Amino acid sequence: MNSSEIRKRYLEFFAARGHRVIPSASLIPGNDPTLLWTSAGMVPFKPYFTGVATPEFRRVVTCQKCLRTPDIEMVGRTARHHTFFEMLGNFSFGDYFKERAIPWAWEFVTRDLGLAPEHLWISVYLDDNEAFDHWRGLGVPAERIVRLGRDTNFWEIGVGPCGPCSEVYYDRGPAYGCESASCGPGCDCDRWLEIWNLVFIQYFRNEAGDYSPLESPGIDTGMGLERVASVLQGVNTNFDTDLFRGLIDYTAGVLGVRYGDDPAGDAALKVIADHGRAITFAIADGVLPSNEGRGYVIRRLLRRAVRKALLLGREKPFLEGVALAVIEQMAGAYPELETARDSVRKVVRFEEERFRQTLTQGNEIIGRLIAEARAEKRSTLEGAAAFQLYDTYGFPLELTREICAEQGLAVDEAGFEAALKAQQQKARSSRRETRYVEERETFFRNLRDEIGLTRFVGYEQLEADAGVRALIRDGQRVPAAGSGEQVSLVVDTTPCYAESGGQVGDHGLIEGENVRGRITDTFAPVEGLHVHEVVVEAGVLEEGARIRILVDGSRRRKICRNHTATHLLHRTLKAVLGTHVNQAGSLVAPERLRFDFTHIQPLSEAELAEVESRINEIVLSNLRVESFQTSFDRARELGAVALFGEKYGDLVRVVQIDGVSMELCGGTHVLSTAEIGPVKITAESSVGAGLRRLEAVTGMEALAFLNSRNEQLHRIAQAVRVPVSELVVHVERLLDHQKKLQRENEQLQDRLQVYEVKELLDRASTHEGVRILATSVRARDMAELRSMLDLLRERLGSAVIVLGSAVNGKVSLVASVSRDLVARGLHAGAIIKEAAAVAGGGGGGRPEMAQAGGKNPEKLTEALEKARQVVLRRVDGGSA
């Protein structure tokens, strides 16, 4: 039975028994920033089991895509370790319990899957007699029902719902056993294969560790598709099922190897297939490779897959093809893969090419470090060196560890951690600031508990009467503030929007019987409490007074234009670049907007033009902009976009742009897109690995930007004395002329270099038959220095050459040793390492060629003399 048929039969079996078939949730847990991945079938339903939310359906069935990485090093080594896997599960939220879950499980595995009852064993929790009796009632012999302890057969996650488990095991026969007297279900050997786990959620554990029965117990089951497929397809490992074998065979063909010929090669192919599935599904769900969080996990998996291919001799990019093979195989069950096809291809291709560049640079360095360690008879790579590879070249520690292990070396991980901690010390000031923020938050939380929440009425009106509830200055409450004083104001009702979700806070005015003031900012230090920064301009502002608050309407309208434009930008970027685009941050201010989003490379001019054009088309369409409140689950069902990492309550606000965009958003917006006016993108930049930033202006600010650019064009045209219409052609001619002059200059420099080389040849000396040249030269950069070295090597033949130059306050050194002298024990890397140390630097390289740098130009002459002395010492019989 193939995996598609197993998946189909499971869903249909429980659908026929009143279960609602729910599509798989994203690998990114919705509305739960505490979880990195959806790692189990129950994760999407966690709020229902914990009582945080009320389920729409009391019986559901799913095939949930899951991702786990704690045992990443075991993938490919064992029969069943995976990063990405599928979990079949049926769930009851206060509906049926053991009396149905157990008979249905038995019916499905014996009838629908056709597994022989004599091969099935059952485990129950030690004192779960109820489950034991249900299994016995189905005809399972008592000797094939084993009672296991809390470690394996009791599910709990700290405080909250919990309960005993019952597992279905498939007995593969004595040939797969460990021959231990205690061998049975629960044993770690390969005989007993757990294929289904039924969790009976019937207790609540409190903070004291006490358990009480739940009024409405529930069911949470999980059947690993890969495991049950291995049983039904009669194969020894999950990797030999149809879920993996096609990918493995495809990869083997691309790499030019055969699966089954070599255990090490087979393990590498398994890793590539497993990791290829994980990265394809994760990228399709919106995760981009980066240096932190989920992005780091995906980057690590992708790089491990590439490394395994390199070990099999693959030098060219290949992983894009593996990802497409995953899509071809799995899109029938997960249509989001087809939707994200182009995004997955682009991301995988870009990341692999980028990593191969990193590998080229890093492998050269780590190869040198390993050679040095061996030369010095060390069995460990220094932690500081491993950290430099990580910090400077983006070389992950685990990759350094793997490469070193292949060469029989360990990595000083304690030293690595020490170097990492030393770098983290630089962040102490930010941690002090964090403590200050925490103390400030505690103050305002206590204030909120005392005076109550602020009622926000700013969606409907820009003016409101309010009562002054508190005045704060320098972290302390004060009874009043006089003219010229600045104070933080808390009221019971306000039309002022507090800074949130990237939108800046409102400005405005306050008016009272004896007071007038100006609001310069509005923020919410804790949820539900609006704080207004006020400068009192006349009279006295007192606690308990009644005032009127007036929002700066002109400023608010500009903010609304930019906020709605931000939603349009988000939607348009997804349409133009791909579904992998997700918001990563924003700033919505009156004069401009800024939008950070997930994308792996700079936008081309054509892409920027298309994004801008599409947004302005929507603006001109005069589409209606509406907002409404609904439950979080209902909003997601409607297709509303939620920001990853954000925590939402049960009731959320949805902003909908007719037929174009729907997002969860608490900000203020225009009523129709035509109010936005022209939208102009002003800048595009990088803000980190896998993150891009767009900046834009709207309305009159967009017009002012265009006018400014037009004025600049006219000024440039006047300066070069051509009409604006001819400016591009004229600049192109100037650039061509500049390139011609640059080429002529380089030719002159080359001629000068040849003359200088002739002069340098006379500086060479001979000692014991070895020609030595250690001298300073004029060179603009390291490339020119190496060029001079190459010319001298050709002219001198058998020789040791060390050249140095001082440019921009730094020392550059290069060295070469001819092959015949390498055979005599001279080593360019060793020579230059000692010389660079004199100039306050370091470096190294191969025996024949090396380079280094230094911080002290005044030590250049001394460093070159040191190099000459090292050569003389070696020639005279010392060490080089």
Curated annotation (Swiss-Prot):
Binds 1 zinc ion per subunit. It is found in: Cytoplasm. GO terms for biological process: alanyl-tRNA aminoacylation. PROSITE patterns: AA_TRNA_LIGASE_II_ALA. It comes from the Bacteria. One of its GO terms (cellular component) is cytosol. GO terms for molecular function: alanine-tRNA ligase activity; aminoacyl-tRNA deacylase activity; ATP binding; catalytic activity, acting on a protein; transferase activity; tRNA binding; zinc ion binding. Keywords: Aminoacyl-tRNA synthetase, ATP-binding, Cytoplasm, Ligase, Metal-binding, Nucleotide-binding, Protein biosynthesis, RNA-binding, tRNA-binding, Zinc. SUPFAM superfamilies: Class II aaRS and biotin synthetases (SSF55681), Putative anticodon-binding domain of alanyl-tRNA synthetase (AlaRS) (SSF101353), ThrRS/AlaRS common domain (SSF55186), Translation proteins (SSF50447). Its cofactor is Zn(2+). Its main location: cytoplasm. Zn(2+) binds at residues 563, 567, 665, 669. Its EC number is 6.1.1.7. It catalyses: tRNA(Ala) + L-alanine + ATP = L-alanyl-tRNA(Ala) + AMP + diphosphate. Belongs to the class-II aminoacyl-tRNA synthetase family. HAMAP family: Ala_tRNA_synth_B (MF_00036_B). Consists of three domains; the N-terminal catalytic domain, the editing domain and the C-terminal C-Ala domain. The editing domain removes incorrectly charged amino acids, while the C-Ala domain, along with tRNA(Ala), serves as a bridge to cooperatively bring together the editing and aminoacylation centers thus stimulating deacylation of misacylated tRNAs. Catalyzes the attachment of alanine to tRNA(Ala) in a two-step reaction: alanine is first activated by ATP to form Ala-AMP and then transferred to the acceptor end of tRNA(Ala). Also edits incorrectly charged Ser-tRNA(Ala) and Gly-tRNA(Ala) via its editing domain. This is Alanine--tRNA ligase. It comes from Desulforudis audaxviator (strain MP104C). The lineage of its organism: Bacteria, Bacillati, Bacillota, Clostridia, Thermoanaerobacterales.
